[in-house]
Structure formats: structure tokens, C-alpha cells
Amino acid sequence: MARRIVVESYPYPRVEDLQVELVERKGLGHPDTICDAAAEAVSRELSKYYLERFGKILHHNVDKVLLVGGQAAPRLGGGEVLQPIYILVSGRVTTEVRTGGGVESVPVGPIILRAVKNYIRENFRFLDPEEHVIVDYRVGRGSVDLVGIFEAEDKVPLANDTSIGSGHAPLSTLERLVLETERILNSRETKERLPAVGEDVKVMGVRDGKSITLTVAMAVVSSQVGSVSDYLAVKEEAESLILDLASRIAPDYDVRVNINTGDIPEKKILYLTVTGTSAEHGDDGATGRGNRVNGLITPMRPMSMEAAAGKNPVNHVGKIYNVVANEMAALIHREVKGVEEVYVKLVSQIGKPIDRPRIVDVKVRMEGGREVTADAKREIEAIANSVLDGITGYTEKLVRGDITVY
């Protein structure tokens, strides 16, 4: 049976043509992003263990991660963590597997602890996963009959939920600028040049006509600045980096950058952290409260509210459909001549094959506001079918970490 793919003209103005556009990104060290990353790290490690030990990825969803902020006392030139950050991983995990030789237990606890601590160790320079963080877990336990799974296995996994996936292409100028601003501040090159720049960077972009204002919350590592003047110099260099980036991404816009607008330097009120993240002192986080699958929060665009991070990469459509919707939109924009803007939505039905959505809704804005032609519709339908035919390939990409969901 043919898939239900509906292609229509998008009746609204381009985002770039709106008077006002708003875009946000919560960076690597933001508490919400830490939760997304921890959830995804655990899912990947569980998937790898299941594959290596049992030959297939078993059921798990660890998309409920909570971070409770600690307490710290940063000061110019130093500081200390007084109360560690607490990270709780929760969800559902297959903990026992019945095989031909009996029941085998899965070392879920060590896998979870190792995944989260390794992620912190690999991505933070001043946050010690042993000294500054307590990692805990509370997971619903389940068992599975491996023989029965292989005997009943369908070629295409069945959706384990009824969900919506949403994606769009291309990114607007503001979206690209916000995304790349956080990335450049958290790049290896910037950390070597400006080691005082912490990992907790949040970027809020506001475009009003041809004017863009970037408000950047940038944690500064207290041990790397010995005075207020050192701190201000770091801010100035970071601003220069961002303005240089903006001159390449948004050359036709007047761009202003405001970093740490809550600072009162004359009173030594500065955004200082011991570890590089605000999570050290009372800023809490949770999975799904931050960036969408494309790495951005875009209130001017249709968005899914699913927390993709930590969901299993085999049949949880809350994860897979959001990834696929963005991929489908990007391909349509790139390959179909005359397409200016694309919005894709996928709707699943629980228990149905994931390559057979209940509906695929594609809205396209053609150049010049023209109606979408019959030829363009056929091309778009062919791309949508091709992406869905290869949907199971996204599982491996997610497990390898080739695709990020935050």
C-alpha cells in the first residue's frame, strides 16, 4: 500500500521575511543540555552492550534525566565546589535476558555510571566527574525472551508510540548564526586561545528587520581570570570572535553582541564559575527542556515537544521521526529546484511499521511564492519515500553518535 504523502504550498511568509525572528541555543554546558547529553550517552552505551552481547538492541528508554544544581564559591583566581551536582538517570531498561542457556543479567548500573562520567570527562575541562558530580540512577527493570524476539522479529520495527516528528530546512541566517556562535565558543581552538571561556554558553538571537542582537550568557572559569580586567578582556575577545563570525554568516545585517548582561564590574558582580557550568550553583536541568533535534529552539517554526535524547534508536518514533523529518526537509530543499523553504511533519501509529507513518505532511514555499508544481510534488514524494525506505539505517548512525539530537 502506498504511503500517504501530502505535499502542499506553504501559505505564509518566509521566516527571513518576518519583521521579528527569535532563536535560542543552550550550549554544551547548560544544565538542560547536560541532561540531554547524559541521556543520549547512556542510550548509546546500552545499545552497544546489547548489540555486542545479544546481537540486537533491546528495549530501553532513559529519557528522564534530572540535574540538581550544586553549590560553589568561585572567586577571581580560584574557588571551590561546596556541594556536588546531582544527576539522576531514570527510565526503562532491559535488565534480564532469557537465552537458551538461562537468564543473563545486564550490568545496567555500571553502564549508566560509566556513560555519564565518561561524557563529562570528555567534554568538560574543569568539571571532575568523581569530585564534583554524583551520578545516580532509578530505572524500571524489565526482562525479555531473546529467542522469542528473534523468532517474531519483523523486517521493519513497529512504532512503540503515537508521536509527531517535525523538521524544517534551510536554517535561516539567524538560526545559523546562533548555532555557530555557541559552537565557536565551545570549539577546541577557542578553549586553547581563551581557556577562561566555560562550557556553559547560552545564545539568544533576536532579529528585528535587518538588525540582530545576540545575548550571550557565557560562564567564565574563575581560576583562569585573576582580576576584573582579566575577566573583561575575555569578554572582549569573545565578542570579537562572534562579530567576526557574524561578518561571514550575516554580512547584510547589523549585528550587536551582548555578553553577560547581568555583570556589574565595579561591584565585582561577574558570571564566574569554578567548573565552567552554572549547574555548580543551583541551576537545575532536565531532559527535553532545551534544544530540539536540530540543536536549536525556534519558536517561529513548527516544533515537536518530544524529548528525543535517551529514547531507544530502534523504534521510538519520538526520536527517529524528528531526525528523519529534518533529514527529509534538508534533502527536499537541496534537491528540488525552486524550493525556498520546507516544513515536514511525520505522524506515527503505535504498533505500525516505522517506515509507514500515518501521514507525511510536507509544506513547501517555492521561489517567488509560486504554487508547487506537479513535477515538484512528484520529486518531493520520491525523496520522502526514499528516506522512509532507509529509515532503519538511522539506528546505526544514532548509536555511533553520527547524529546528535540536542
Curated annotation (Swiss-Prot):
Pfam families: AdoMet_Synthase. The keyword DNA-binding does not apply. Its EC number is 2.5.1.6. ATP binds at residues 140-145. GO terms for molecular function: ATP binding; magnesium ion binding; methionine adenosyltransferase activity. HAMAP family: S_AdoMet_synth2 (MF_00136). PANTHER family: S-ADENOSYLMETHIONINE SYNTHASE (PTHR36697:SF1). This is S-adenosylmethionine synthase. It comes from Aeropyrum pernix (strain ATCC 700893 / DSM 11879 / JCM 9820 / NBRC 100138 / K1).
